[in-house]
From Swiss-Prot:
Residues 1-20 are annotated as: Disordered. CDD domains: PoNe_Nuclease. This is UPF0102 protein Daro_0503. It comes from the Bacteria. Belongs to the UPF0102 family. GO terms for molecular function: nucleic acid binding.
């Protein structure tokens, strides 16, 4: 059986999200949803931090030829994450939230709290 490149990419992404989720849970967050999708946007992990929500983008790069994992989070990507978060928050008035990123470059993992805001 031949493995398609897309299947491999999906598996790597899932592994990165699993690794990020474990790290976030060790840091005190509780993962409440994974891969929340709407038309035009997606959030990798949605976590609970006390009474607030944390929307987490997970980016992985095995090589830095085109910049590290953080370089791949463009303004357009941030807008799509914010759009998905706004949709998720419908019906949840007065819910505090923030946007974090987990960057995985090779074996190194970095958790950036408050990585961007809805106004960026």
């Amino acid at each position: 059986m031949q493995v398609k490149a897309n299947d491999t990419t999906t598996a790597r992404g899932r592994e990165a999200e699993d690794r990020a989720a474990r790290h976030l849970e060790r840091g005190g967050l509780r993962v409440v949803e994974r891969n929340f999708r709407i038309r035009g946007g997606e959030i990798d992990l949605i976590c609970r931090d006390g009474k607030g929500l944390v929307f987490v983008e997970v980016r992985q790069r095995s090589r830095s030829d085109f910049g590290g994992a953080g370089a791949s989070i463009t303004a357009g990507k941030r807008r799509r994450i914010v759009l998905a978060a706004q949709h998720y928050l419908l019906g949840k008035p007065d819910c505090d939230c923030r946007f974090d990123c987990v960057l995985i470059d090779g074996e190194q993992l970095e958790w950036i709290k408050h990585a961007f805001s809805a106004d960026d």
